[in-house]
Every structure is written in structure tokens, then in C-alpha cells.
Amino acid sequence: MNTNVPIFSSPVRDLPRSFEQKHLAVVDAFFQTYHVKPDFIARSPGRVNLIGEHIDYCDFSVLPLAIDVDMLCAVKILDEKNPSITLTNADPKFAQRKFDLPLDGSYMAIDPSVSEWSNYFKCGLHVAHSYLKKIAPERFNNTPLVGAQIFCQSDIPTGGGLSSAFTCAAALATIRANMGKNFDISKKDLTRITAVAEHYVGVNNGGMDQATSVYGEEDHALYVEFRPKLKATPFKFPQLKNHEISFVIANTLVKSNKFETAPTNYNLRVIEVTVAANALATRYSVALPSHKDNSNSERGNLRDFMDAYYARYENQAQPWNGDIGTGIERLLKMLQLVEESFSRKKSGFTVHEASTALNCSREEFTRDYLTTFPVRFQVLKLYQRAKHVYSESLRVLKALKMMTSATFHTDEDFFTDFGRLMNESQASCDKLYECSCIETNQICSIALANGSFGSRLTGAGWGGCTIHLVPSGANGNVEQVRKALIEKFYNVRYPDLTDEELKDAIIVSKPALGTCLYEQ
């Protein structure tokens, strides 16, 4: 595996599938805007999660892939005494922006209270600037970055990792512009610096999106681990005899206002899985570590409990190292403990019942668990949430085992077996984690009835996108699934959609190459 970000050059050879036509269009659009040709294009793709929903903040590994939609940043380096950045977006909804770069080499200011598209570029600029100061302090500590004209173009749908792809492309563009065309940046370094980029606009993500955008490979899924450190390993899908593997990504067009719904949705789920971990720790008399650098895990999480349980009761002092067989064995044990501990309270725990389960007072429980994030609830569904996290983590390992060691006698065997895991994931997201919605369930049902083998939500849920495992090639079902979704979902629920909006709502993709540079 190439450890550095790939660089392609003119004349065009071996460009990523999704980039073959787009690079010509973005070069032309750049020329129409700035009346010169760009020096290079920084590209970063969108992503979808194949299996592994709402388990990353419990530090369990996930299985995403990069897709054939991307953010392109075409760049012309400027030799200016007072350097500035001019940003133009292909989408006219986003106005052109221009900002001066600090002459003393200080960081560009970012105001997270302002919802502004250029802030995401500034996030990438900021982490790239920090990286440059570390690798070449004598050059970048007290002098400004170079100025540039930049044209941004994207076809990544909402929920497909647009902001993360933008920050990755922006960081790569900044490093290339300042270090020259012969400088190589490792995928590891680009992932590491961009994993925290969006924190500067108040988005506390964990690095999965950036790792997927950077490490993506054609025809591969990525096994993204969060312990002992962020790591992405590509795994190739099996070679089939008569079909190709494609994914249909269909947007429900349901937008969940995260600020308004977080107290009953995302924030509440984080609280519930944290309380579940501590209730299990109390019941089995083990201590959970505190992660002070992560408010989500400050009081420990469900993976911490698994490691602590095995340290005490199975004499396994070392935490789980990611081994598939060991992980499957331990997760099955965790599911057994969840049944033993919570199954009598499937209706949920009141604050009084939860505090009793943690051997603390109601006041202590409120202080420790209900003040970090605003939440609203009648009961905490510890059984359902813990069962989802452990069973979903188990499905990730089963999927990985299937990709690395299973033998399939027919193409249909693969689609059936892998699709079953995706369908089980959707059922768990819907019934146990309750992060699906009516529209998501409708799309999944229509797709499954018309040629998809596995259909599920992808991303946070409560709307957003769905992903469907569909055979492609001469005998494939892609067009059949796409046509059914248009006729039975979009035309019924959204009859006023334009052809362009419909085109954007359904994407057909194979696993795509990650972040790269194209030199003109």
C-alpha cells in the first residue's frame, strides 16, 4: 500500500474513476473565473459507512469506504507581497470570499459562531499551517503562507462527508502550495492533522471521516480503528465471477436539525451508552478509565468495560488488540452480560433507577451524566443501546472476517451473506438505537424488493443517506433499484423534485480512491 498521498500528473494516466472527466471541467471553470490555468488540483472524496453505526464514540472499529463523489480544489499559486486567498465556489449559493494572510506568520482567525462555507477551508488551512510550522519552523514561524486563487467544486451529498472532504482538500492544497510539487505528505500525517480540523468550527468528530477520505482505495473497504490510535487499513472486496460490487447511495432528503434534536437523539444516545457502561462496571465491580481529552468518554465507555471485565475475570491484562477472532469471542460475551444485566428493564431506567444501578445519589447522577450535554428523556434505554453497540461491533468483525477468509461458491453467496449483515445493522439501528426514520425504512424496503441485497442507513441517521449493496455489470440490478426508488419513493414523496435534484439524490458508486493531487 502506498503510504503517501498519490500524485497524478499531466498527461493523464491512471486517474481515479470519478476524476477522469471532472478534472477537465474544474480546470475550465477555474480559467473562466480567474483567466489563468491552475497549477494543481487537490481532491478528496466523500464517504459512507458500510457497517458500524454509532459505535465509534465507544471506540469500536467501523467499516466505511470512500465513494465516487468528491471535493476538488483547483489552485493557482500567487507571488504577492501581501498574500491573500481568493475562494470561489462552483455553487452560486456560496459567495466568493477573499481574505489576507497574516504577514507575521500567525494563524488565520476562524469565528465558529458564524455559519460560513469558507470556514471549512480555513480549518484545513489552519492545521496545514501548524504542520508546516513543525516541519520547517525557520521558514513558516514568522513569515506568511503563499497566496492563491482557488476554485472549489463538489458533488458530495449532504451526509456524505462534505465538510471533512473539504478540510482534507484544503489542508493538502495548502501544504502543496507552500512546499512545492516535489513534496510528499504521508497519508498518516494528513489524517492526523485533519482529524481535528473541524474542531475549530465547533464540530467534535473523531477522525473516521478524514481517515476514510484520505486512505480510500478503489474496490476496498476500510477497517478504521480508534485504539490504541487512529488507523485505517484497506481490505479488498472479493473478486466475483459474473458481477461487480456497487453501492447505491440514496438520500432520504430528510434533514435533522442537529441543534434542535440533539437533546432527544444524538446527545441522549451518548449519555445512554455511557450510563450503560458504568452500570455494567458497577454490577461487575470493575473500574473504567477516564478519557479527559474526550468529553464523550470522560466517564468511560462500553469498550472500556469489555477490556476491564476481561482483565478482572479472564486474566487478560492487555486490552483487546483488534484481533478478529478474539473480538468476536469477547463481544458475544458482552451481549450475554447485557442480557443478564438489563433485560428485565427493557422498558428503560428512570433517573432514580439509573442512579441506584450506579450506586450513587440522584444528585450525583445528574451532576455526572446530565450536565455535559442538554438532554430530554423519560427513561434511559440502557438495554437497547448497549445491545446495539456490542452487536453492531460484532457485525463489523463478521464483515471483515467474510472479506478476508470466507470462500464464496457463487456471486450470490457473497451478496446474500454480506447483505444479511447490512440488513441486521439496519434493524438494530431502527429498533434498538432508534436512529432510523419512516423515509429511511421506506427506501430500504423498496430497494430490497427490487434487487438490493443489503440496505441500511449510513451516517448519524434520523434522515440523511441510505446505502444499498447491489450487483452491477451486465447482469446487475443497479438500474432496477434506481428506477424503483424514483417511481415508488421520490416521485411519491417529493413530486416537485427537478431532474438535477433527483440526480443528486441517488448516487451509484464503487469504493473509490482517497485523497490525491493532480499536477497540471
Swiss-Prot record:
GO process annotations (BP): galactose metabolic process; maintenance of protein location; positive regulation of transcription by RNA polymerase II; positive regulation of transcription from RNA polymerase II promoter by galactose
Gene Ontology CC, one term: transcription regulator complex
KW ATP-binding (keyword) present: yes
Induction text: The GAL3 gene is a member of the family of galactose inducible, glucose-repressible genes (which include GAL1, GAL2, GAL7, GAL10, GAL80, and MELI).
Modified positions (N-acetylmethionine) in chain numbering: M1
PROSITE patterns membership: GALACTOKINASE
Keywords carried by this UniProt record: Acetylation, ATP-binding, Carbohydrate metabolism, Galactose metabolism, Nucleotide-binding
Alphabetical list of Pfam families matching this protein: GalKase_gal_bdg, GHMP_kinases_C, GHMP_kinases_N
Record-annotated disulphide pairs: none
Top-level taxon in the UniProt lineage: Eukaryota
Cited InterPro entries: Galactokinase (IPR000705), Galactokinase_CS (IPR019741), GalKase_N (IPR019539), GHMP_kinase_C_dom (IPR013750), GHMP_kinase_C_sf (IPR036554), GHMP_kinase_N_dom (IPR006204), Mevalonate/galactokinase (IPR006206), Ribosomal_Su5_D2-typ_SF (IPR020568)
Gene Ontology molecular functions: ATP binding; galactokinase activity
Function as written in the Swiss-Prot or TrEMBL entry: The GAL3 regulatory function is required for rapid induction of the galactose system. At normal induction, galactose in the presence of the GAL3 protein may lead to the induction of the GAL genes, including GAL1. Then the galactokinase protein (GAL1) in the presence of galactose may reinforce the induction leading to a higher expression level. Upon depletion of galactose, the inducing activity of the galactokinase protein may decrease, after which transcription of the GAL genes, including GAL1, may decrease.
Note: Present with 721 molecules/cell in log phase SD medium.
Family named by the database record: Belongs to the GHMP kinase family. GalK subfamily.
Protein's UniProt name: Protein GAL3
Protein's organism: Saccharomyces cerevisiae (strain ATCC 204508 / S288c) (Baker's yeast)
Gene behind this protein: GAL3
